[in-house]
Amino acid sequence: MEFKRHNDFSEIDPAAWNALVEQSIADTPFSRYEYLSEWWKTLGGGEWKNPQLILVSASDNGSLVGIAPLFLHEYDGQQALLLVGSIEISDYLDLIVREADLPRFLPALLDFLASSLPETWSALDWYNLPDASPTLPALKAEAERRGWNYHEEIYRPTPRIPLNGSFEEYLSRIEKKQRHEIRRKMRRAAESGRVRFYVVDKNADIEPELEAFFHLMVQEPNKALFLRDVMRDQMSRSIRAAHEYGYLWLGFLEVDGVKAAASLNFDYKNKLWGYNSGVSRDFMELSPGWVLLAHTIQWCCENGRYEFDFMRGDEEYKYRFGGVNRYVMRARAIR
């Protein structure tokens, strides 16, 4: 295996990168070339100041085998190598490598990082690794073999709704009180004659829909604080990239022809990944946020999606809708 450090994302072919992602342990929207390369341009919407890119690829006979998208930054008392995308806006991160290649890729990667980087680093600090990622036991074993200090902890819950049937079948599995509440709110919205749910067409001009989404997002004070200019730029880049590559799912609920709620998701690998949302305060009597989420789950059921992933966060509504916890982890190895 031949390892190479790259100074820029443009040095790796996007098609080869994404083809590897789709065969890898990291097959999520957040590992794709278009997402991570755009993330790097704004450093996660201003999350990091002056990090150093450590983008490493491994090839066999000219064929891409693995990618370690890393950056160097002082963090938590160490000169740490973190995964590009860390920490706050990329819900799942991992090494980009086929599971069968991980046992030879990871030790060779660590050897390369230890021997070939002119920069001094003292830790690997990898956030948002899925709890089922084979990277976790592999990194633990490799760190122990090298005499490094290894620590692993739950970072955030990522509740998910398993879906394998009709919307009625889904409703039958959630708590009775919540089932009645969802049905009641959907029925009230429908009977008002004022409400329309729609999903933005994949061929639509995304710019006006993007503006409408941000307008709704900032109705919530915490999200308004979050969506400063550099973060808005970052999110716009991510949304445009997902739209260009065909996996953006942006749904709206209109009341009297006015957009009252928005749901931003990635429709990727036969599941919906719930990334963000926004709700107007003008139509709260119709519970537009709840009604839109219910319609979104119904859409998943009717279109054969096997799961709705709420992604990171333990907000109560996720569990009311039947979310079951999985987790993303933080793995830290100090040498």
Identify what each model region corresponds to.
Residues 149-158, 325-335:
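Conserved catalytic-core motifs of GNAT/GCN5-like acyltransferases
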Residues 2-86, 128-158, 162-284:
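A conserved beta-strand-loop-helix scaffold within acyl/acetyltransferase catalytic domains
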Residues 73-151, 269-321, 325:
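Acyl-donor binding region in acyl/amide transferases
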Residues 24-28, 72, 117, 193, ...:
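A generic secondary-structure signal for well-formed alpha-helical elements
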Residues 179, 184-188, 312, 318, ...:
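Basic side chains
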Residues 157, 203, 314-315, 332:
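Conserved beta-strand edge residues that scaffold enzyme active sites
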